[in-house]
A protein has these predicted regions:
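Extended catalytic core of nucleotide-activated donor transferases of GT-like folds
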Residues: 17, 24-123
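Donor nucleotide-sugar binding/catalytic pocket of nucleotide-sugar-dependent glycosyltransferases
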Residues: 112-145
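Conserved catalytic-core segment of nucleotide-activated headgroup transferases in glycan assembly
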Residues: 137-193
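Short alpha-helical segment that forms part of, or immediately flanks, the ligand-binding pocket
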Residues: 197, 220-224, 242-243
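Acidic donor-binding loop of glycosyltransferase active sites
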Residues: 198-214, 227
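Short hydrophobic beta-strand element within catalytic cores of glycosyltransferases
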Residues: 228-237
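C-terminal "capping" alpha-helix adjacent to the active site of nucleotide-linked donor transferases
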Residues: 252, 256-273
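A charged, aromatic-enriched C-terminal amphipathic alpha-helix characteristic of glycosyltransferases
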Residues: 269-303
Length: 306
């Protein structure tokens, strides 16, 4: 998001590590509101643009940002109850959805503008007649670029806190790992962008088995590297990434272990097929997810906030 805002000439403010959170969500998700570790040093290390500032609660209220984003169910309580009463006269309010939450998790009663990263949010915005943009995140195509075809048998997975957040899907992949001895599964649950890019570069593809749709970074980044993504057909149904998951190009769909084994063996054992899919994958995704086009749409969305 910082790169998209930078392209539009906007500054992004994020709560600093000394921001004292007052309003937490209800159990069982009340252990998290947002990342509370941001410092100036961390921003310089993690973010490539110069348009990001970490600020305290007092600074946010003093600056009065043009737009205040709720970025998830977990932090809507802090934003709406602690900040918005003091900013409602000067700022616009929007919700950036990056996980397909349940219907009542969204503050329909209060927020009119929605930046949707998942298909469920799009459908719900249509139902509640809200203003929305089905937005694709800015992808760093320079960092996640196609360098060369790869051989070998490494298959990567890049789902944060996989075993804790999605235990059933994690167990499914672990079972595949035990059944498919010809593959070297690399399950990365805490990797940095640099570590993710390195693993993708070394791998032949990615496996992404998850019932909940997120922002979509890992899937698109893998495709950008020329690493097709194995997707569980049933779990992928109705997800927004189906718009760029092209069978035998950017994605390989499977419904059970046998189908996964057949398709993964073909990818590993047939060099001509593997190299064709990897190269075409990296080309196709750049056509389907275009940073400049998405940023232009984001600019229009921000200019026309209700």
């Amino acid at each position: 998001m910082a790169m998209a805002f930078d392209a539009l000439g906007h500054e992004m403010l994020i709560p600093s590590s000394d921001y004292k959170i007052t309003h937490w969500p209800n159990p069982p998700v009340n252990q998290f509101v947002w990342n509370t570790e941001w410092t100036d040093e961390m921003v310089k290390k993690e973010i490539k643009t110069d348009n990001v500032r970490v600020v305290s609660k007092e600074e946010i209220l003093d600056i009065k940002p043009d737009v205040v984003f709720v970025t998830g169910y977990e932090n809507q309580f802090e934003v709406l109850r602690e900040l918005w009463p003091f900013l409602s006269g000067t700022s616009k309010l929007a919700f950036y959805s990056g996980n397909d939450y349940w219907e009542d998790a969204y503050p329909w009663y209060m927020i009119e503008n929605y930046l949707c990263a998942d298909q469920l949010a799009v459908g719900l915005c249509q139902k509640y007649e809200k203003r929305f943009l089905n937005y694709r995140p800015w992808i760093d195509y320079d960092q996640f670029k196609f360098k060369e075809n790869t051989d070998g048998n490494i298959l990567g997975s890049y789902i944060s806190e996989y075993d804790k957040t999605f235990p059933k899907e994690y167990e499914f992949v672990k079972n595949l790992q035990s059944e498919c001895g010809y593959l070297d599964f690399r399950i990365n649950s805490h990797s940095t962008k640099e570590e993710t890019a390195k693993c993708m570069e070394e791998s032949v593809g990615t496996i992404h088995v998850k019932g909940l749709e997120g922002y979509g970074f890992a899937i698109i980044e893998s495709m950008a590297c020329g690493r097709p993504v194995f997707l569980h057909r049933e779990l992928a149904e109705g997800k927004s990434y189906m718009n760029w998951a092209v069978e035998n190009n950017t994605a390989l769909f499977f419904g059970n272990a046998l189908e996964f084994m057949a398709k993964s063996k073909a990818l590993v054992e047939c060099k001509e097929y593997r190299h064709f899919v990897q190269k075409s994958c990296s080309i196709t995704i750049r056509k389907l997810v275009n940073n400049e086009q998405q940023t232009e749409l984001l600019g229009i969305f921000l200019d026309e906030l209700l």
